[in-house]
Amino acid sequence: RDYAALYDYQGKDCANTTRLWFDVGQRLLDEQRDEPGDGFDPMGVHDRILMPGAKAFAAAEYHGTYIDASFFGSMGAMLEERIDANRTALEVVAGEGFNPGSPAQVKKYITESMGDLVRLAVRKGYMRSASAEQSTDRETLQAMIRLWGKDDDRSLILQRIIDFRNDTKVLQTNVAGLLGKMDDDHRIRPSFRAGFAAPDKKHWFVEVDYAQLELRVAAWLSQDPAMIEVFREGRDIHGEVAVAMFHKPADQISSGERYMAKRVDFGILYGRSAKALAEGPEMDYLTDELGGERWSVEQAELYVRRFLEGFPVLRQWMEDTAKNAIRDSFVDTPLGRRRRFPYITRAGVGHTRRQAVNTPIQAVASDLCLEALTRISARAHEFDGHVLFAVHDSVALEIPKARLKEASKILRYEFEQNISIDPTGIPFSCDIEVGSNWGVMEKVK
């Protein structure tokens, strides 16, 4: 190995990064001094949040995450068997040598055997637009399956194409990809969750996850008393929203209705429009898995309106935040970030308004997670644990079984109490789950 070349590269990398810092750091200081707004604090974000977080992630990457090679090996064999079975079955109907992974071949097969029906699916609203006729992506194939029904022979063929593509991608990306990146100690260093495991029987794989973090942040930012009351009393926020959306008693809310209420909850906060909700992938899950009916854009608009009617103070905060962003061309977050909107066109006003509302919610939630990870990384030695990685608003760790009780107390404290904002009576809660691997977990009470 040419370590001399590596040393030379790393030295230049560090030297050039340092030179950049003097330039970029000065720009941040100048912006903080010259730009309007009391909440803008780029150097504070850098010093308090980003640099400590970078060190915590570096430590996690250095330690690595143990993966179960035998699990992924077995999964790879199973996927290869399914891929071969689907390829063989499809060759029977589409001809020898047919490649389900080739968009051109799939398009040719569909055009020759189902072309007129693709146009029918567009006209009946199962596809978004006529451009879908030229596509063979998953969404288009699923739209045709919905048109004909799952048990139709044509649907079974299309489902085999979908399964072939999915299994091939999973095999190449997740199984072979992970095994190819595994080091000699069975760790990788940057569903398959069962392949991410505790290294031995003396350790737990642990995940700490904020509960409904964005919604709690929205309640904190807006100080909406109705939302705050739901969280204080430990009620089900998604169930409450479903009652308001569908005008039904709580005991009559179906799993599909609660699921869609959850999508509306988070969709509004994530800056999604009613049209995006009506045309989103959750509609496939609602119809295919939960037996519900697809929404029209008008229905989605009605449900969004009902959600906001249930939380009027949140609605006013959203309106004020959006107005100020249009006026100022930026929005600040309570922890010092700023998002700029330098080019607001008439056609893009709606998008800008949604992003202005989404930014402080997402930014605060993200910063709280990063700060929690940083603090936990600094304290993990107290229970002989290691931070492995973070996913969305959760942190994964490796903890000795004998130290789980004291570790849980520290984790709950850092996630729920030792946070950088004053929650003003809104409980920020987390769930802790443990298991021998990421696929089989139980909650710690």
Predicted features and spans:
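Conserved "right-hand" nucleotidyltransferase catalytic core of DNA-directed polymerases
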Residues: 1-184, 197-204, 211-214, 224, ...
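Hydrophobic (often cysteine-bearing) scaffold residues that line and stabilize catalytic clefts
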Residues: 13, 214, 234, 238, ...
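Conserved catalytic core of nucleic-acid polymerases
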Residues: 55-62, 243-383, 387-390, 398-401, ...
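Short acidic, glycine/serine/threonine-rich loops at helix termini
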Residues: 111, 217-220, 440-444
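Flexible, glycine/threonine-enriched loop-and-boundary segments that flank and lead into catalytic domains
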Residues: 175-189, 371-384
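Function-dense linear segments that define catalytic or interfacial modules
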Residues: 184-251
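A common structural junction motif
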Residues: 413-422
